């Protein structure tokens, strides 16, 4: 087998893989231009890449455009894979600087000879970041470029504009050799027309369509009209996550959450929730047990605040049964009831009217008497020898018909009511203990 033909087949296969980005294990990024290549080929011709691949395992090698320009690298990359330079003219000084940067001494004399073969009169072209824009009338395939002339079948002003500004069609990988020119010439004109009409998909498929630029710079008035109508129809209901109330605007929801933060409501909310961008943008409320319970508590608090003046005029009091008081823990410190709420629980108890917090139940009860203009009377709860009576002392106004000499509390005494104010019902006790 001929060694020369074997090497030629190998180079052609590697170059084809580079063109379509297939089986390439390396990407060289120069600015915003990306080149697919093989590590072995780059390391064989450049000591710069050889040292990088030895000490680095990254698949993307980033190079600054100030070190080597994309058109110079594309020129040298084509020589590495084909052994011959593309039909284009590059600046000789910049070419030498790029070769010195890559430490590709072997490519120095080849690139110089190839650059001197073509004179500026034979090929007049401009290379911009690897995209070749040709001014000739025939199809020319360059580095990373496929220039096609506008089809003659087009009529009208659009045909004239496309004739002055030919469209650009790029392959999947930047870099095509001259071997594919015959295949590109065989493509029918209908496929070229379809390629002209397709919009750009990625960075590697840039197009010089003046009409598309004009359409982008001057948007149609229909799009401007439909914009506000879409925003008006997309109004969302703002929902409080802590008590279940709904609001029409975000500002009302933010003011409502301030009441949670300040402690006016029995649900503690962190202050950072007020600075959230997605405040109140929630889905419709699920009718689960937690939401129903939260709404019930919030409506109860509002109802109690409205009925507050009526309670001050009443002389009678509702007794709190021992069965209700038994919900309170026997510990000296307040505990948390198992209410399965989603908000955070705190040890302190807050007043449902003004929001003040107290560490003990007795202090909270004394504070609630101040809202009614009455003085809290400690002496009305007589001390008993039994420890159970001492725990219930802050919630009792009087224990009637009990002898001071008795050493225990009988079952009849446990059935007697405790004279508390009417607000301390079962729901009020739950509200006081849970925050």
UniProtKB/Swiss-Prot annotation:
A UniProt-annotated Pfam family: BTB
Keyword Oxidoreductase included in the entry's annotation: no
Gene3D superfamilies linked to this entry: Classic Zinc Finger, Potassium Channel Kv1.1, Chain A
Keywords in alphabetical order: DNA-binding, Isopeptide bond, Metal-binding, Nucleus, Repeat, Transcription, Transcription regulation, Ubl conjugation, Zinc, Zinc-finger
SUPFAM superfamilies to which the protein is assigned, alphabetical: beta-beta-alpha zinc fingers, POZ domain
Zn-finger region bounds: C2H2-type: 238-260, 349-371
A Gene Ontology BP annotation from the UniProt entry: regulation of cytokine production
Cross-link (Glycyl lysine isopeptide (Lys-Gly) (interchain with G-Cter in SUMO2)): 142, 148, 198, 204, 303, 330, 405
Sample GO molecular function, one term: RNA polymerase II cis-regulatory region sequence-specific DNA binding
GO cellular component, one term: nucleoplasm
Keyword presence, NADP: no
Location relative to the cell: Nucleus
Coiled-coil region: none
Residue ranges occupied by any BTB domain in the UniProt entry: 1-107
Function field: May be involved in transcriptional regulation.
Protein name (database record): Zinc finger and BTB domain-containing protein 25
Organism: Gorilla gorilla gorilla (Western lowland gorilla)
Encoding gene, per UniProt annotation: ZBTB25
């Amino acid at each position: 087998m001929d060694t020369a033909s074997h090497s030629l087949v190998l180079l052609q296969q590697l170059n084809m893989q580079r063109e379509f980005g297939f089986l390439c294990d390396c990407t060289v990024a120069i600015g915003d231009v990306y080149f697919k290549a093989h590590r072995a080929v780059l390391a064989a011709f450049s000591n710069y890449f050889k040292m990088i691949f030895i000490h680095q395992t990254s698949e993307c090698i980033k190079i600054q455009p100030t070190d080597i320009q994309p058109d110079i690298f594309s020129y040298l990359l084509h020589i590495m894979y084909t052994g011959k330079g593309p039909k284009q003219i590059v600046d000789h000084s910049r070419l030498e600087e790029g070769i010195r940067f890559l430490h590709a001494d072997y490519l120095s004399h080849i690139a110089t000879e190839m650059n001197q073969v073509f004179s500026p009169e034979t090929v007049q072209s401009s290379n911009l970041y690897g995209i070749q824009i040709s001014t000739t009338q025939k199809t020319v395939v360059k580095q990373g470029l496929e220039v096609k002339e506008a089809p003659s079948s087009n009529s009208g002003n659009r045909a004239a504009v496309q004739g002055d500004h030919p469209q650009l069609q790029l392959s999947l990988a930047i870099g095509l050799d001259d071997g594919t020119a015959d295949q590109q010439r065989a493509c029918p004109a209908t496929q070229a027309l379809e390629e002209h009409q397709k919009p750009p998909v990625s960075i590697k498929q840039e197009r010089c369509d003046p009409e598309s630029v004009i359409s982008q710079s001057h948007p149609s008035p229909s799009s401007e009209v439909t914009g506000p109508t879409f925003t008006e129809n997309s109004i969302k209901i703002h929902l409080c996550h802590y008590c279940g109330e709904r609001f029409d605007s975000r500002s009302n929801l933010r003011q409502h959450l301030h009441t949670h933060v300040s402690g006016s409501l029995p649900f503690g909310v962190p202050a950072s929730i007020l600075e959230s961008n997605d405040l109140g943008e929630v889905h419709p409320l699920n009718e689960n047990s937690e939401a129903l319970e939260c709404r019930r508590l919030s409506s109860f608090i509002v109802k109690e605040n409205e009925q507050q003046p009526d309670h001050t005029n009443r002389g009678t009091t509702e007794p709190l049964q021992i069965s209700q008081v038994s919900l309170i823990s026997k510990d000296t410190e307040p505990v948390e009831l198992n209410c399965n709420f989603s908000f955070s629980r705190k040890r302190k108890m807050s007043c449902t009217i003004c929001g003040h917090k107290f560490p003990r139940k007795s202090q909270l009860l004394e504070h609630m008497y101040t809202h009614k203009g009455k003085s809290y009377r400690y002496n009305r709860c007589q001390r008993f020898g039994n420890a159970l009576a001492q725990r219930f002392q802050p919630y009792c106004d009087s224990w009637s018909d009990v002898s001071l000499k008795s050493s225990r509390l009988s079952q009849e005494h446990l059935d007697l009511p405790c004279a508390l104010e009417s607000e301390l019902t079962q729901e009020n006790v739950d509200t006081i203990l849970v925050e």
